[in-house]
Structure formats: C-alpha cells, structure tokens
Curated annotation (Swiss-Prot):
Lineage: Bacteria, Bacillati, Cyanobacteriota, Cyanophyceae, Synechococcales
Keywords of the record: Dioxygenase, Iron, Metal-binding, Oxidoreductase, Vitamin C
Cofactor note: Binds 1 Fe(2+) ion per subunit.
Annotated Fe cation binding sites: 98, 100, 155
Residues engaged in binding 2-oxoglutarate: 165
Protein name: PKHD-type hydroxylase PMT_0286
Species, as recorded: Prochlorococcus marinus (strain MIT 9313)
Entry keyword Metal-binding: yes
GO MF entries: 2-oxoglutarate-dependent dioxygenase activity; iron ion binding; L-ascorbic acid binding
Cofactor dependency: Fe(2+); L-ascorbate
Length: 221
C-alpha cells in the first residue's frame, strides 16, 4: 500500500498549534518513555507529556480533523485514531530504524501518521524515511500536511543537523486490517465517486456502491 500525503491543517491553524505547543515549556519529556523496548534503544527526541492539558486539547484537534477529512476516511477507513503525541527533535536528535508495535494500550496499529508542523526549510535533516522492498522513501512535507502509511513498514527519522523538527504522530486502527484489502476498497470507492461526480446516479453505479459496501461489511473487523 502506497502512503497517502495530504493537506490536513490550514496555515492559520498550524501557526496557532505550533505556538501553543512551544509555549508549554514544562511538559516536554524524554521520548523514550513512550517507545517499545526495541525502539527505545534508537529513539532520541522530546515528546509532549500526553497527560498535559496542552497535549490533550491539541490531540483532539488533530483527531477531529482526521476523522472529518473525506480523503483520509476513504483511504484509512478509521475505526479508532489513537496514541496521538507531539514530538520535537533538535540538533543531534532523531529516531533510528524501527517498526511500530502491532498493539498498544490504546489500540491496534494498522496505519501510522506524521503531521508536519513546521516548514521543511526551517530545519536540516529530520526526514521521515520509510523502508520499501527495494529502497527508502524520504519525506519532509510542508507544515499542515500529513503522511499516512502502513504501520508494518520499517521507518526512521534522520538526525536533525540544524534547526528543529516539530511533528504530531499517531496511529489508526482501521475497520480493514489488511493493507491489500484496504487498497482495493480505496480504488473502488475512488472510481465510483468519480463516476458519480461526472455522470450522476445510475442503476449501474448503485450496483458498484452496493458491491463496495458489502465488501466493506465482509472484510471489516
């Protein structure tokens, strides 16, 4: 399954969110506290205490945006968005190659997401590297854009060499646990919606939407 990159937050919302996070100087802590035993060995960043007021309020903002975005809903089929946290990495910090835990206290991880909160030119290094079968995909998106990718992927964050990287990360438990099945459903839904927009409703299109809905019902968990 190919990752989805998509604008999620507008400029004003990102600016306000960034200012709020950085103003809370007392709630940032060692990121290894939230890592699994294997990932903790390669994790070197700061994360906002999930129990802080700042984290709780702004996590809900991000979750609501993800839950209400039509493309995200079609791509991820989210049942539960969980584990949302805010992370910052300064010079010399990063996160070595690892895979996310399959199950967390907050839910199953089918898809992982990273929402970028500052512009790529404001820091050097810090790219999200997602390992594929043949190579590695490096990602640094504009502020407000999100990447959603399978949690089964090995991935890392390059060491920051200048400036500071600020992101929001989290996980999605999907109604469809299989990446392959989710890809098929996404393509079927996208094609049906495009036909609806171009030609309007028809008995034939009703059959396609019926097939999509019943496949979702059959494959879903």
């Amino acid at each position: 399954m190919e990752p989805l990159t998509h604008p999620l937050l507008d400029e004003a919302t990102v600016s306000q969110l960034r200012a709020t996070l950085l103003a809370d100087e007392t709630s940032w802590q060692d990121g290894r506290k939230t890592a699994g035993y294997q990932a903790a060995e390669v994790k070197n960043n700061l994360q906002l205490d999930r129990n802080s007021k700042t984290a709780k309020e702004n996590s809900q903002l991000v979750i609501k945006q993800l839950e209400s975005d039509p493309l995200v809903k079609s791509f991820a089929l989210p049942r539960h968005i969980h584990g949302v946290m805010f992370s910052r990495s300064g010079i010399g910090q990063g996160y070595g190659m690892h895979v996310d835990n399959a199950y967390m206290s907050s839910g199953r991880s089918d898809l992982s997401f990273t929402l970028f909160l500052n512009e790529p030119e404001s820091y050097e290094g810090g790219a999200l590297c997602i390992q594929t079968l043949q190579d590695s995909k490096q990602v640094k998106l504009p502020a407000g854009q999100v990447i959603i990718y399978p949690s089964t992927s090995l991935h890392a964050v390059e060491t920051v060499t200048a400036g500071e990287r600020l992101v929001c990360v989290g996980w999605i438990q999907s109604y469809i646990s299989s990446n392959e099945d989710r890809t098929i459903l996404f393509g079927l839904n996208a094609g049906a919606r495009a036909l609806l927009a171009e030609h309007g409703r028809s008995p034939e299109l009703d059959l396609i939407f019926q097939a999509y809905t019943n496949l979702l019902r059959r494959l879903g968990s």
